Amino acid sequence: MPDVVVVGSGPNGLAAAVILARAGLTVEVYEAQATAGGGSRTAELTLPGYRHDVCAGAHPMALASPFFRAFDLAAHGVELLAPEVSYAHPLDGGTAGVAWRDLDRTAADLGRDGAAWRALFEPMVRHWQQVVDLAMSDLRRPPADLLTGLRFGLRVLEQGSPLWNLRFREQTAPALLTGVATHAITPPRAIPAAGAGMLLATLAHAGGWVLPRGGSQAIPDALIAELERLGGKLVTGHRVESLDEFGGARAIVLDTAPAELLRMAGDRLPDHYAKGLRRFRYGGAACKVDFALSGPVPWRAPGCELAGTLHLVGTRAEAMAAEKTIAAGQHADRPYVLAIQPGVVDPTRAPAGGHTLYTYAHVPNGSARDISAAVIAQVERFAPGFTDLILAKNVVTGAEMPTHNANYIGGDISAGAMTLRQFAFRPVPRWNPYATPLPGVYLCSASTPPGPGVHGMSGLHAARHVLRTEFGIHTDPLDLLRTPNPA
């Protein structure tokens, strides 16, 4: 039996596994699916030669998170491609908000709100590493840079409150910010959504939202290659039924949802902790629709053709109304649709002349409805003629999401509702959210701080506790990652 068993091969599980292996421990990773990668996988879902990302498609954190800055994906063979436009937000009438990687260019395009956009983001972009370090922390200690933390916090409070329109005079800039805040799958005028929006929009102007050449699978593949180089082992197609399977391991690290911990632990968990896990709420879901296309999407608004990611919902008011409908358990007639067009930078995703379009729409948790018609209508709204380009499509409803990734309960790709309480206390109120009451058993999924995203930081924080508590190793995980070629 190895020193450590990791259950789940998503980016957090693999991040923990690599850190623990770099510390000299023997590590085995078990994955229920036939392929590894969790929320960062790529497959031919529509037609041969059309490669689609199964969940995560654009990666703001691949260049930014402390884990990936130390691991250095490029040094491990991953080519990260940055579109000139990180994201765009088309509006009716053929206009769009365009988040260029260049902050000044973005502000120049925003008319009367350009100065407000620059004032909102310039201090954040200038100190982007400190912003990321704060947002990607375990939320249990004060920020190292108090001034940047204060500036960021005040901006989040503003955008998460009734004051959110105070600095804006037109519709484009607030829509551009709301589109990214709505990644949280919650009404965007809320603190957790505002925090996500401020962080991701900052990164749009600080390195960009990169796409790995060949697909998101390149990220877990690089982590797996490093794990195996260090002597670690990956086992796919193995659904863990009970923690008792690994009784000889000194530590078990779970890149799983709280519901999976409850299942695998059986009656071993103390009542108070088990009740806390059962109270953990899962939020709105995603209905994923992937398209194989005969050509590029014919966006009406200039700038959209250069964007890696687009948010299709309309104005800030329309986004708020759509998300309130989802939160009430109903389907929106015009749902929020997130679209990614990898072909703007990566021609390997489709045969010559072809393109892929990744989309998902927000739906109520557990929804079994195929809403591809509503998705197509939202794309067609801003790109007339899109329908004529569709060669094939693949739909995964919210209810079907857990069959692809067991952490997405009811289709919740955030692995837990992004409420204010669950923003700080994931999955239960504990000073150490990674340790469970079971000796040697830890959680490292997106259901722990800092939450969803391909960043590896939940895995890093959990690995730090495993090293210190179970093995008496106090070396900083980031130092382990920076050590060249450890034996």
Predicted regions and their residues:
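N-terminal glycine-rich phosphate/pyrophosphate-binding loop and immediately adjacent elements
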Residues: 2-130
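Rossmann-like flavin
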Residues: 92-191
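Flavin-binding catalytic cores
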Residues: 116, 296-297, 330-333, 367-406
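A glycine-rich dinucleotide-binding beta-alpha-beta segment and adjacent secondary-structure elements
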Residues: 170-185, 333-338, 385-449
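Helical element adjacent to the flavin cofactor pocket in flavoenzyme catalytic cores
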Residues: 200-241
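Mid-domain catalytic core of redox enzymes
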Residues: 236-350
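A conserved FAD-binding loop/helix module that cradles the flavin
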Residues: 446-467
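Active-site-proximal substrate-binding core of FAD-dependent oxidoreductases
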Residues: 469-487
